Every structure is written in structure tokens, then in C-alpha cells.
Amino acid sequence: MENMAEEELLPQEKEEAQVRVPTPDSAPVPAPAADTALDSAPTPDSAPAPALAPAPAPALSPSLASVPEEAESKRHISIQRRLADLEKLAFGTEGDVDSASSLNSDNLENIQTCPLCPKEKFRAYSSHKLRRHLQNLHWKISVEFEGSRMCICHLACRPVKPTIVGEQISSKLGAHYHCIICSATITRRTDMLGHVKRHVNKGETKSRYISASTAKSSNEVLKETDTDIQVFPNYSIPQKTDSYFNPKMKLNRQIIFCTLAALAEERKPLECLDAFGATGIMGLQWAKHLGNAVKVTINDLNENSVTLIQKNCHLNKLKVVVDSEEKEEGDGLEDCSTAGDIQVTRMDANVLMHLRSFDFIHLDPFGTSVNYLDSAFRNVRNLGIVSVTSTDISSLYAKAQHVARRHYGCNIVRTEYYKELAARIVVAAVARAAARCNKGVEVLFAVALEHFVLVVVRVLRGPTSADETAKKIQYLIHCQWCEERIFQKDGNMVEENPYKQLPCNCHGSMPGKTAIELGPLWSSSLFNTGFLKRMLFESIHHGLDDIQPLIKTLIFESECTPQSQCSVHAPSNTNKQEENGVFVKTTDDTTIDIYSAQGKRKSNEMAINVAKKQKTDASTAHPPFYYNIHRHSIKGMNMPKLKKFLCCLSQAGFRVSRTHFDPMGIRTDASLTQFKSILLKYSTPTYTGGQSEGQVPAPEDTVTDPVELSVNDKAEVSGCRRW
């Protein structure tokens, strides 16, 4: 009976021995020596035939004793941390590896096989040869990643190449590597290096086979405006990351925050949408600093970005709502009673904007935004705000003119005022999209900097507003010789000589066709002074010091007033109002309140009166475009300082201000001829070789009387010589 019991248990023990993995905690007992085995061998009647030592399990690694069993069952044997771990697999022992040195080359049953090579490919009759094989072939050309080595494998493994459809299986596979992250099989070492690098660029540095407790997060934590966010290691490369974060767009995020803060003073709560969340930094700033005044929705189509947005919400102790279900981190959220909830969605931006209505929509796609304008104006609420950030500056700044014609349907060339031209192109596209939805727009401000073009408009519902908006889209006549420009006159009649509209006389003095037609462009004002002053107040209230100089420049530019004549801090004028200790100048046409103090909308008569008032005050709008003082400097003359020249233009009776589009640009209602004449009047001739080297010319500020030039000097300045 005992022999029968042993025979019944023996197959079970064999099966357990085949799946047993040698680990540091439970090492397999080494096989007894040949002499000892013969002495203790049972009788032939009761003993089965002597079996070979069980081969090591090829699917598990002994170096992961602390990893869960599920992780161990999936990790391939070719992935090891040390060479000793690989040798343990080969010799099947944890202790003295030299115990296998007693192998006899004459005993064919004790031939050692490589755990990563088939038997027909490699056979070792000595432990030394097996060690050299493991070290020189498998370990030497392995790929290292986070302390682990992906050794080359020659086994007949199943080729795995994950795709959207599923796993692709091929019939032939030679030497290959097993990816530690996605278990894909890669044949070449260089391809394996590139494969792992792509995982790192996407932020997929955690192995699927390592538990979350042992894996270290490779995401970097950044802080901007008291908001913490996690970003991927390659967050600054938009082509290779799922969640792009650009630190250079900080001004863009701050000015949009001031816009939303100014709108939140009109009505509460606001339903806001960040259609392209990426890391969610913008929506997090809205919810964290404005609290219950806003209901923020952050959307992104990428699954990894949505996961990262949820992590950033928990990092900033904000409640996350996904599919009408509230997800909380657990601890730390009880103190956030003033912070608003954030709804995170994963769908196409066009679909989301068609399904829901919002008071504030921000569009910041990668490139042009024309594909999302129709859906943005489809359901935006009346008197809501739509902000559009365009980063396709190569087409807007006339470097790729065919792309601008394709996306915006306009003809442009490179001019001295190309940044304002880009802003007017985007506003025209926004206005046309709003008009298709029977809505008009009021431009609150437009900003064009080095990296982006930002346009913010207020939506006015109704076909009347749409018609008024459509009338403000006109063509521009641009002179290619002197760069004078003017918008075409209203009307559909064809003029016999359109060159007469230009103030310059280049067509009569120069041969050929001298002017081109640009556009269609937005021809009305680009700034709302009252709204900009409220934005300045919000920036001071929230402590955004970086954006205040830009907003002040926009205010001066909207009023077309030099900064020396208009100060936002000096309460010297009775027409100025105080906002939190900051005095800002107010005019009759700047304060436009659509909502009463109780947050309710005023009557339609009030809105009609406001529209009439805007129409009567149209003459106070700032002049379009600007001149670059360096571009029109006179040869052989030293031009005056910029501040002094602004005062000279103002004293001559022209409206003048600086512009944010160009640091050396001057916005004025003077024509180019008048601009050059005043520049010539206050310029001084350059000192030539007759002056000694040590003599320093007098500074321009000390010059009180303008320099009178003779007729010959004027002729030389204009480029002509009088004989």
C-alpha cells in the first residue's frame, strides 16, 4: 500500500517540480552525487526509472521574489537584473555554482543547456563554457533599462507586436529581445533601443510586470501660479508626447485667466470649457483661484492626457467629476470647500461643444483653430466669451502664404505690420464663423506675440449683430513700395482706379503695378478699453505681476494715447475711478455693463442703447496698423528717441501710442508722408570724418530747436543729388 501511495504521489510531485521557480527564499536542493544516488537507490521492483533533473521554468525570473505572483507569471526569463541571476537559471542552484563542475563530458545525460537557447543550437559539456556563453552572447549585448537587462533570446517564442487590432503573429523569428514594458518582441538591438526610447518619450516608464509599490514615477512636477502639475519627461516636445506643456505660454494662460475673472464679475456661476486640456493647467488655475464662481470642464481626446489631468486635479486637492460621478482622492479634500469641481471629459472638442452650452470657451489646438470655430459658436450663450489661441504662426506671419489661403481664405504678404495683420486675419475667421450661426462678435482684445496669436471676442446673438459684424470684414490695399495701406471703401461698385484710395503717389512715380490687395481682414477696432481696465484690476487683485505691463500697453494702445500722458496710477483726473487702490482712466465709451449689480441681464432696450452708443463713438476707435520707426528712418540722419518722437507727433495734433505688436512700432492716425516729414524734422545729421574721435555729440534730449536743412541736404536725404 505504501508503494502504491508513492506511485500515486509521484506524478503530482513531478508536476510541482516542473513549475517550481528557484528563488532566494526557497532554493531548490541540488541533485545528489552519483555515488550517493546508487547507495540509496530503491529496488528495481518498487522504484521507477531514474528521471532527469527537471529543467528550470523558462517563463519566470528568480530576481523578482518580492514581486506579486501575477507579475512573475508574465515577465520573461530573458529579463534579469544581474548576471548571477542568469547563471542561476542555467545551473538551477542558488548556492555554489561550482557544484556543477563535477559534470563528466562522457556522461551525455548531464549536458548543460542554455536557458535562452534551444537544445539543438547550443550544448555545453562544462560549466565554464556555459558561463562564457551566457556572458558573451546573452549578457554582453543586452539592453539595460532602469536596472534590468533585456538579454537576447534564441528560444522559439511567440512574436508579439501590439497593435490596435491585436497581436500580430508571424511564423519566423530568430534572435530577439523581449520588451520589459509592453512584452513586444524586437529582433534588432538598435530597434530595441529606439522602442524603449519611445516608451520613455510617451511617459510609459512603468513596466506592466512590476507592482505599483516598487515602480517609481518618472513624471516631473512643475508649479505655475500656485498650481502644481505633473508632466511627462518630454512635455516640451509636442510631436512625441501625449500631453504637451509649454512654459513659454505662461503669458497666454495669465491673460486668459484675467479675462475669465473679469467675466465672472458680471454673472455667476460661469460654465467654462478648456477644449484642449493637455495637462489641465489652465482649467486648474480657473477652479483653484476663482472657486465656486466657475464650473470648469477640461476636455481632451487623448486617454493618457485625461489620466494625467485627473492626477493633477488630485494633486491640487480638487474634486474630479467623470461621467457625472464624483471621484475624490480621499484625504485632503475636506478643506477645499471653496474650490470648484472639475469635470474631465474625453471626447472630440467639436462633439462636446455641440452637446453642451458654455459661457466661456477657450480653444488652443495644436495649429490652426478654424476647424473648431463653427461648433464653438453653435451653443455658446449670449454675451459669452470665446477665446482662440492660434499657434500656426508660420501661415499667419506670411511664411507659408498658401497655408493661410487654404485655412483662412485670405491673401497676405510679409509687411512691417505682419503681427497685427495676423490678428485681423484670425478675427475675420472668427467673425465669419459667428455670422454663420446668426451671431455677431465684439472684439475685446487681440494679442500677437512670438509664439501665438490670441483673440478674445464677446458673442452677440441675433441676425442684426451678425450683419453688422460681417460688414466689418474688408479688403486692404497695400503699397509695395512705401508700405502705405488703407482699407477699401464700402460698396460693391468696381472703381476705375483703386490706386487713388492710397494716400501715397507711388503709382504715378513708379512703373508698373505698385499695390496689392490683402485680405479679407477685420477692419474695426481690436480692443475694448473698459474690459481691459477690468482685466488690469483682476490681475492686480490676484497678484499676476507678469501680465500687468502687457495689459497696460493694451490699454494705452486702445486709447491711442502715449504713456506719458495717461497713467493708471495717478488720480489727477476727475474722470478716473479707483479700483482696489488702482486709478484707471475712464471715458464715456469704455464702460459697457450688460448685467446689473444683482447679476441679472438688463432689458433689450439697454442693449440697443449700448449698441447705438458704440456706433456713435466709432470715431474714437484706435487707428488701424502702425509704423516701424527703424523701417522709415532716413539715411544719413540720427532719428530721435522713441519717447521724444511720440511727443512730437502728439504736439503736431496726431493721435499716437506705442503698440505691443512691435517694440519699435508707433500707432498713429498720421499718414506715412506726415510721419516721415515729422521724423525728418526732428532728426539730426550724422557726424562724419570731420569730427574728432574723442568728441561726443550732444544728446538728443538737449536739442531744443529742430535742425533746419538746406535744399541740398534735403535732396541728399531723399536719395537724390542736385547738380
From Swiss-Prot:
The modification Phosphothreonine is found at residue 23. Residues 220-679 form the Trm1 methyltransferase domain. Its EC number is 2.1.1.-. Residues 32-44 have a biased composition (Low complexity). There is a cross-link at residue 576 (Glycyl lysine isopeptide (Lys-Gly) (interchain with G-Cter in SUMO2)). S-adenosyl-L-methionine binds at residues 253, 300, 348-349. A motif (Nucleolar localization signal) lies at residues 128-132. GO terms for biological process: adult behavior; adult locomotory behavior; tRNA N2-guanine methylation. InterPro entries: SAM-dependent_MTases_sf (IPR029063), Trm1 (IPR002905), tRNA_met_Trm1_C (IPR042296), Znf_C2H2_type (IPR013087). It catalyses: guanosine(27) in tRNA(Tyr) + 2 S-adenosyl-L-methionine = N(2)-dimethylguanosine(27) in tRNA(Tyr) + 2 S-adenosyl-L-homocysteine + 2 H(+). GO terms for cellular component: nucleolus; nucleus. This is tRNA (guanine(27)-N(2))-dimethyltransferase. It comes from Rattus norvegicus.
